[in-house]
Regions:
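FIC/Doc superfamily catalytic core
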Residues: 1-172
Length: 172
């Protein structure tokens, strides 16, 4: 018989970890100019305080948007911010990660599932996007046919980098 005692089932994260995950998730939305709803903030607080489980928080956010009779343009932005924040909170408190192209596309799918039809897919067309952080200018994006190879190259460079040799006094 195989002994599975060494495999411990992951439980709910602690208060500090949940707080950090929510703050990070909401902060990532702010980078894109998105602001979460007051309802998400209150629901996140309840999750952090242990008044509700994460699954209950996730369901409350989902139900909040399903119950809206009419939608405004602002609702679309808060829906994206709230849903992505909820997904990011979940990802950040899991103790799993695959440093691969498949892992990266899986993260994209899990963050944007229910928000964008293309969640988890590598784009097959070229894009430009006006970035508010660049005062409306755009960055140069990798050409669609080269994305897969560019990601694989970047991941390999990261795998080979030895962070133990970085002077901690020089790091941010």
């Amino acid at each position: 018989m195989i002994d599975f005692d060494e495999y411990i089932r992951q439980g709910e994260p602690q208060k500090r970890e949940k707080s950090y995950a929510w703050q990070t998730a909401i902060g990532l939305q702010a980078v894109d100019g998105l602001k979460p709803s007051d309802y998400l903030i209150e629901t996140a607080r309840k999750d952090i305080e242990g008044e509700i489980t994460f699954n209950e928080a996730k369901q409350l956010i989902r139900s909040y948007y399903q119950s809206k009779a009419s939608r405004t343009p602002e609702d679309s932005e808060t829906y994206e911010a709230d849903t992505a924040s909820t997904h990011i909170r979940q990802l950040l408190t899991e103790k799993t990660f695959a440093f691969t192209l498949v892992g990266l596309t899986s993260i994209h799918r899990r963050i944007f599932e229910g928000i964008f039809k293309f969640a988890g897919q590598i784009r097959d067309y070229n894009i430009t996007k006006k970035e508010w952080v660049l005062r409306g200018d755009t960055v140069l994006y990798v050409s669609a046919p080269d994305i897969r190879k560019a990601i694989e190259y970047d991941l390999e460079q990261e795998r080979q980098f030895d962070y133990s040799k970085v002077d901690p006094n020089l790091s941010l």
